[in-house]
Amino acid sequence: MRAQYVLDASALLSIVLDERGHQRVGGILDRSRIHAVNLAEVVGRLVRSGMPAERAVATLHELHLEVEEEFGAGQAEFCGALMGTRRDLGLSLGDCVCLTMAAWSGAVAVTADRRWKELEGTVVNDETIRIELIR
């Protein structure tokens, strides 16, 4: 079954750190996936906060979340176009990877970043961006 949701780093961190919004993410986790780039952001954030890398990785594996590793030329072009046209939102590469993955698969991008709501319904290269805020 194709994932209905694509999580960004903030959404996954809400589960791991028991932050506000974690209930919503927990409720859709079995229908969600994340890109490896965003997973790397989560591991980095956990390690920076003092969690040993091995523990961070083990904690994330326990969630059994589908991890997407592919990112082709077409997706890179979409991602770059998004980064270039919405610089005003301060989107990182990881943000744009998540948004690209969601738009290309017809899924909803899930985030805690309120700035993303401005992207709801944006069409880039014939793909529509859909956003859900967890808080």
Stretch-by-stretch model annotation:
Residues 12-13, 39, 116-117:
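A generic structural signal for short hydrophobic patches within well-formed alpha-helices
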Residues 49-53, 86-87, 126-130:
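Short, hinge-like loop/turn segments at secondary-structure boundaries
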Residues 5, 31-34, 63-68, 108:
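Short loop->beta-strand "edge-of-pocket" segments that line small-molecule binding or catalytic clefts
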Residues 10, 43, 113-115:
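Anionic group-transfer/hydrolysis microenvironments
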Residues 1-34, 46-58:
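Short, well-structured N-terminal submotif of metal-dependent ribonuclease cores
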Residues 37-72, 76:
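Active-site-proximal, substrate-binding regions of enzyme catalytic domains
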Residues 2, 99, 103-135:
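Acidic, PIN/NYN-like endoribonuclease modules and their adjacent C-terminal/linker elements
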Residues 68-114:
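Active-site neighborhoods of divalent-metal-dependent phosphate/nucleic-acid chemistry enzymes
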